[in-house]
């Protein structure tokens, strides 16, 4: 057991403050009425803040998530230690595009990794910088071609990502 168990608890109001002070708060400053998502890199945010704050993130922790999401993450070789806990899309431009990611959040202090396509800094707060991809896909889109599942499964991970863009 831990030696200083009590120090792991937050002071009154501290947990709520931590929950409400993540990158979601910076995303809300954008006042963007479109339906899109944001991805992040090493922001230190807590899980499920997007659900609480009313934003759309690529990060969540939900034990009854659709199994196809885990399957997709496995097929894309995303490093997800648990099937129901997703942190981000690994900063992969292709996956961000497919997931309708319009914004990318990093910590303000020091430059973090910003994927290709996020050229414009949309907003800066005390803690975060949010970049925008002006070519983000909408949340819903359709394909006019397809490949059989058997053929798809034989592709490498990079070929699978490329196939999803066709």
Question: Which residue stretches match the model-derived regions?
Answer:
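Soluble catalytic regions of membrane-associated enzymes that act on cell-envelope
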Residues: 1-166
């Amino acid at each position: 057991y831990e030696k200083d168990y009590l120090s792991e608890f937050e002071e009154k109001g501290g947990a709520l403050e931590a929950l409400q002070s993540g990158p979601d708060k910076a995303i809300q400053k954008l006042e963007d009425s479109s339906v899109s998502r944001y991805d992040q890199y090493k922001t230190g945010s807590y899980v499920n803040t997007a659900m609480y704050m009313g934003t759309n993130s690529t990060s969540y922790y939900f034990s009854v998530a659709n199994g196809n999401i885990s399957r997709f993450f496995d097929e894309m070789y995303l490093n997800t230690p648990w099937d129901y806990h997703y942190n981000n899309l690994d900063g992969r431009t292709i996956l961000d595009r497919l997931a309708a990611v319009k914004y990318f959040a990093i910590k303000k202090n020091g430059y973090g990794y910003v994927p290709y396509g996020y050229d414009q800094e949309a907003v800066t707060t005390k803690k975060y910088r949010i970049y925008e991809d002006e070519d983000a896909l909408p949340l819903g889109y359709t394909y006019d071609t397809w490949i059989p599942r058997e053929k798809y499964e034989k592709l490498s991970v990079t070929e699978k990502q490329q196939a999803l863009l066709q």
